[in-house]
Amino acid sequence: MDSHHGYPFMTPEERELNLLYDEAINVTGGFDVPKFPDEFVMEGQIVPVVFAHSEYMREIGSRYCKLAIETYNKQHNTNFQFTELIKWNAAALLNYITFKAIDQNSFGRPMKTFQAEIYDHPGKDELDQVEVEFCRLAPPDL
C-alpha cells in the first residue's frame, strides 16, 4: 500500500499541498506556510492567526512582539521599538511572528523586519506565561 507520505486519506491535491507545506516549514521554519483548506486540519499544523479584524488578537500579537524585541535588545545591546505586526502563524501554543521595528538610536534609518518564536505556557500566571524562544532579524528576502 502506498502511504503517500503517511497520509493515505489525502486527495492528490491535498498530498501536493502537504508537500509544499513541508517544504515551506523546512525553508522558513514556520514563518511562511501555505494555508490548507479549512476542512483539512492536521495535528500540530502551523496556521495563520487572523488578527486584522480583532482588537483583542492585535493586542496579544503586539504584546508578543514587544516582549520579543525587548529580548533582542537585551541580547544585542540595541534599542529597537516595535512598530507593526506583519504576520502571525501558530501551532497550538507556539507562535511564529513577523514584525517591524525601528532603531530608536538611528534617526532616519528604515524599519527592520524581525521574526520571533514565542511559546505561550498554559496555566501560568499572566506575567510569566510567555517565553521568547528567539528573536532575530528576518532573512533579507522578506
Per-segment meaning from a language model:
Residues 1-56, 86-142:
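Compact beta-sheet-dominated globular domain cores
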Residues 50-80:
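Short, non-transmembrane alpha-helical segments in secretory-pathway proteins
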